[in-house]
C-alpha cells in the first residue's frame, strides 16, 4: 500500500497510475481535501482528508510502505500569505506524525524550486535558500520538518524533491497555455526571450520518483527539471517547430504587460488566467540544474522537444 496526500491533483493522479502500472504498489490510497476522479478504479481508494488536521491512523487497512506528501497550497495568486504557511507547515507536521503513528519508514515530499527565489545563473541543490514568495517561504521550513522526522529514528528514509513547473497530459497549466497562445498567434515574451525557464515533464518526474525509491541513502534532496534547462526563446522555438507555426513571437516589456494584465483581470472580475502576478512570475528567471540526479547517473528520457512529442501521443486532445 502507498498513500498519496494531495493525491487528487495532477501529479498525484499520474503517480498513482504509474505505481500501479509498474507493480510498485498493489493498492494506492489518495487522500485529499478534494474528491479524486480515480476513486473506485482497480487498486485505488480515496478519502477526503485535510492535512491541516491530525490524520487518523486507520486511513488504510494496512500500514503504507511509502507515503507521498504532495499536499500543498501553491497557486499564486489566489491565497493570503498566511494560508501558505498554515497549510504547508501544518501539513508537514501532520503527515510526519501520521508516518510515525503507523510505522512507515519511507517518505517522499515535494517541495519546490521556489525555495531558491529567482535564479539568474545555473542553480543546483547546493545554492542558498532565498525565497521571494510566501509559497517558497513556506516550503523550506516544511522540508526541515520532514528532515526532523527522518533523523528522529533509525531506518527512516526521506526523499525531498524540488520540482520546477510540472507539465504534461491533462494539465491546463503554463506550458499548455503557451502552446495554445503560440498556435493562435498571440503569444509574446514577457520581457526577454533569453531568460532561462525550468520545467519538468510529468513522465520524467515519475521516472525520478522510481529512481529515488530504489536508492539506499537515508536522505536525498534533489531538483527535478528537464536537462538541459533552456532559454524561453528556445522553448518557444521548440513549440513552433512542433506545431509547424510561423507566427512571430515578439518580446514585450513588463511596463506594458503588467498594466495590460491588470486591466484584463479587472474586466473579467478577477478570474483571468492573465494576472499581473503571473506575468511578473513568467518573466522571472529560473535557471535550475538537476545536480543530484546528474551526479547519481539518472537517465533523463526527455528534453523539452521530445516531451512535446510524447505528450501529444498520450493526449492529442490537448493539442487540438
Which functions belong to the PLM regions below?
Residues 130-159:
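Active-site Tyr-X1-5-Lys
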Residues 2-21:
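N-terminal Rossmann NAD(P)H-binding glycine-rich loop of SDR-like oxidoreductase domains
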Residues 290-295, 299-320:
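Amphipathic terminal alpha-helices
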Residues 51-87, 98, 116:
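NAD(P)H-binding glycine-rich loop region in Rossmannoid oxidoreductase-like domains
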Residues 37, 202, 237, 260-299:
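Conserved C-terminal active-site "lid" loop/helix of NAD(P)H-dependent oxidoreductases
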Residues 94-134, 154:
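Conserved Rossmann-fold NAD(P)-dependent oxidoreductase catalytic core, especially the SDR/UDP-sugar
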Residues 211-274, 309-320:
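Mid/C-terminal beta-alpha module of Rossmann-like enzyme folds, strongest
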Residues 171-177, 191-213, 219-220:
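Substrate-positioning beta->alpha
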